[in-house]
Amino acid sequence: MIKQLDKKALRQKRHLRVRKNVRGTSEKPRLTVFKSQKHIYAQIIDDTKGVTLASASTTQKQLKEKLEKTWDENAAKEVGKLIAEKAKEKGITEIVFDRSGYKYHGKVKALAEAARETGLKF
């Protein structure tokens, strides 16, 4: 049986492997996702400058009030919509998606599809 610590270590290894190839630029920044037990976080990062251009999470007051639960797929969809809206405000239309070693399934997939529906291309 795989312990929780082992699962986390395996995810981090996958993330490092992916990060070797996935880079965000100022023209096409990187959208990265992080999941904790209770919240979902998304950031748009320009790796050449090392700057976070936009961020959204279920810890933000505007989402917390709207959501019943902050850790389910509906919450992930709302975070995806919010991060896409913030990106549009900054003039970002194309991104590189970094799933941070998570499977493209469930919350990560919901966040990505909501961002696509709101207008981000990746």
Swiss-Prot record:
Belongs to the universal ribosomal protein uL18 family. InterPro entries: Ribosomal_uL18_bac-type, Ribosomal_uL18_bac/euk. Part of the 50S ribosomal subunit; part of the 5S rRNA/L5/L18/L25 subcomplex. Contacts the 5S and 23S rRNAs. GO terms for biological process: translation. The keyword Transferase does not apply. Keywords: Ribonucleoprotein, Ribosomal protein, RNA-binding, rRNA-binding. This is one of the proteins that bind and probably mediate the attachment of the 5S RNA into the large ribosomal subunit, where it forms part of the central protuberance. This is Large ribosomal subunit protein uL18. GO terms for cellular component: cytosolic large ribosomal subunit. PANTHER family: 39S RIBOSOMAL PROTEIN L18, MITOCHONDRIAL, LARGE RIBOSOMAL SUBUNIT PROTEIN UL18M. Pfam families: Ribosomal_L18p (PF00861). Transmembrane segments: none annotated. The keyword Coiled coil does not apply. HAMAP family: Ribosomal_uL18_B. It comes from Petrotoga mobilis (strain DSM 10674 / SJ95). GO terms for molecular function: 5S rRNA binding; structural constituent of ribosome.
